[in-house]
Amino acid sequence: MSPPPRVLVAPSLLAADFGRFTDEVQAVDAAGADWIHLDVMDGHFVPNISFGPDVVRAVRRATTKPLDVHLMIAPADPYLAAFAEAGADLITVHAEAGPHLHRSLQAIRALGKKAGVALNPGTPAEAVEPVLELVDLVLVMTVNPGFGGQVFIESTMEKLRRLRTMAAGRDILFEVDGGITAETAPAAAAAGANVLVAGSAVFRGGPERYGTAIQAIRGAAERASGQWA
């Protein structure tokens, strides 16, 4: 997975209108989303329940954009094949979700998918050092996972900078998720993020504003990181 030529924006469907879900997917696709981010929650690893493989399958039918599936579930391994078969392009598991992170990442790759590892705000960067050779993406949670619309945790940027240094020379993308807006995107991009997950900041205001919101987040991040589309 080569580094992107610009900062990518991945709208999180957790903030979409579930009553018109397919329309929402197609609207953010048309508005310029680079990826579509799906937050899968089990009510156990995180204190919320969202959706499963059948919803991912429905989203796959509605868009050709890459599907970025973030598994906030424990255990994750029994469900990897189902999400891969449903159409995920990239599957991210949490470092905190089980004792056998190598096994989970190897299983994702064996399914022919890109593999990501996520870190909660309180988990140190060093937790992923042993598996860097197995990952295509590192996701730094910038809020505690479970709910949308939370406030960006600025202190996670130091962890992101450490991860970038730790992974120097590797072909790895760095994603941030939580509290991302046009105001917080510059800090994330300056610290090294090249994939920004945004939920409320994209979906509030209705479909007619999705394109403006995506462009504002991407533009603010690119100016901070020195990248220009």
Task: Give the location of each predicted region.
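N-terminal amphipathic alpha-helix/helix-capping segment at the start of soluble metabolic enzymes
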Residues: 1-15, 22-23, 222-229
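Conserved beta-strand positions in the central sheet of alpha/beta enzyme cores
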Residues: 10, 29, 35-37, 68, ...
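Active-site beta-loop-alpha junctions enriched in small/polar residues
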Residues: 12-16, 41-43, 72-76, 96-98, ...
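Conserved anion-binding
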Residues: 17-20, 62, 66, 78-82, ...
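Conserved, mostly hydrophobic/aromatic
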Residues: 21, 28, 39, 83, ...
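Glycine-rich, proline-tolerant flexible connector loops at the mouths of alpha/beta enzymes
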Residues: 35-53, 143-149, 202-204
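A short alpha/beta connector and helix-capping loop motif
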Residues: 44-76, 80, 185-201
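C-terminal helical cap(s) of enzyme catalytic domains, especially alpha/beta-barrels
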Residues: 108, 189, 203-229
